A protein has these predicted regions:
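Active-site segments that bind and position negatively charged phosphate/pyrophosphate groups
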Residues: 25
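C-terminal binding/interaction regions
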Residues: 2-22, 70-137
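Compact, glycine-rich, soluble single-domain proteins
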Residues: 45-59
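Alpha-helix C-terminal capping segments
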Residues: 34, 63-70, 98-99
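Short beta-strand scaffold segments in enzyme catalytic cores
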Residues: 28-35
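Stable alpha-helical structural segments in soluble proteins, enriched in small hydrophobic residues
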Residues: 9, 13-16, 57, 61, ...
Length: 137
């Protein structure tokens, strides 16, 4: 993928990060998906006092995209203030395996806005559980 697409997607994730609602952890995360048609869809983490209700930036961006009819994702950028790059949690990895299995995932530190690490979804979640719709015994 062209470097300009990568830097543009990281920039979109960084802008989304500014809209994060993280009053408890103060760990703000932004995410941006790139579709094959070139559209960028973003999201930011939203926290709740009941931590189990908190939603990660990756899931917010994914749900935003899916509920607006967007799919066929080619890349995801995730940005936070994390020297080694903000790694997607297990729940986000599962949803990526289901809805964006061919996407390249870039993680970037918000201070430099350069990609720290790059992964395929299969590298993030090897042996992912994928149910077969309608499969029953």
């Amino acid at each position: 993928m062209a470097g300009s697409n990568k830097s543009g997607l990281v920039g979109a994730a960084a802008r989304a990060r500014q809209r994060a609602v993280a009053p408890y952890s103060r760990f703000k995360v932004g995410a941006a998906f790139l579709t094959r048609s070139g559209e960028i869809i973003t999201g930011a983490n939203v926290e709740s006092a009941s931590y189990g209700l908190t939603c990660c930036a990756e899931r917010v961006a994914l749900f935003n995209a899916l509920t607006n009819g967007k799919k066929d994702f080619v890349a995801l950028a995730v940005v936070a203030r994390a020297p080694g790059g903000p790694m997607p949690c297990g729940a986000c990895r599962q949803l990526l395996a289901e809805y964006a299995p061919k996407a390249t995932v870039w993680v970037a530190d918000s201070r430099a806005l350069t990609v720290v690490r790059e992964f395929t979804v299969a590298q993030l979640l090897p042996g992912a559980f994928l149910a077969v719709p309608g499969d029953s015994d």
